[in-house]
């Protein structure tokens, strides 16, 4: 019973936690006409978000495919914003792993609080020669 209570409490806290702030991301990005923000929708609850992440990893979804096409543009700063860090990461990973062409001088901005997510994203970005800016959320 105690384990169930701990599990339910942690799930509730996770569900109530706020996602990355769009304002926080916008303040870190360059203020020029070569900056775009990709708004990533989320499913609304942790279970549905988990299913959405699995779908994005395999099929990409609209946001993942849009990111893959944006990565082909030269001199572009791309911010990824949404209420779910796991969905944001899945979109970023799909875009980086499936971009057929990557433009010159492309940078990607993402807000999160996971060191492992940061390492995964930086590794994928480096493989595609994309400058990754992972802003640690406090």
Model-assigned labels for residue ranges:
Residues 39-44, 79-86, 108-114, 136-138:
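Structural motif
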Residues 111-138:
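C-terminal partner/receptor-binding element of secreted or periplasmic proteins
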Residues 24-45:
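Post-signal peptide N-terminal segment of mature Sec-exported envelope proteins
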Residues 17-20:
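Bacterial signal peptide processing site
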Residues 1-4:
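Positively charged n-region of N-terminal signal peptides that target proteins for export
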Residues 48-107:
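Mature extracytoplasmic domains of secretory-pathway proteins
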Residues 12-15:
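C-terminal motif of bacterial Sec signal peptides marking the signal peptidase cleavage site
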């Amino acid at each position: 019973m105690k384990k169930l209570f701990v599990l339910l409490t942690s799930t509730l806290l996770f569900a109530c936690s706020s996602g990355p702030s769009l304002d926080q991301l916008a303040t870190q990005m360059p203020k020029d006409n070569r900056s775009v923000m990709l708004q990533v929708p989320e499913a609304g609850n942790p279970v549905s978000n988990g299913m959405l992440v699995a779908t994005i990893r395999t099929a990409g979804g609209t946001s993942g495919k849009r990111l893959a096409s944006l990565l082909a543009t030269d001199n572009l700063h791309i911010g990824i914003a949404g209420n779910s860090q796991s969905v944001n990461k899945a979109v970023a990973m799909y875009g980086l792993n499936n971009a057929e062409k990557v433009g010159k001088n492309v940078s990607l901005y993402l807000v999160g609080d996971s060191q492992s997510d940061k390492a995964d994203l930086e590794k994928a970005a480096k493989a595609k020669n994309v400058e990754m800016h992972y802003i640690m959320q406090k």
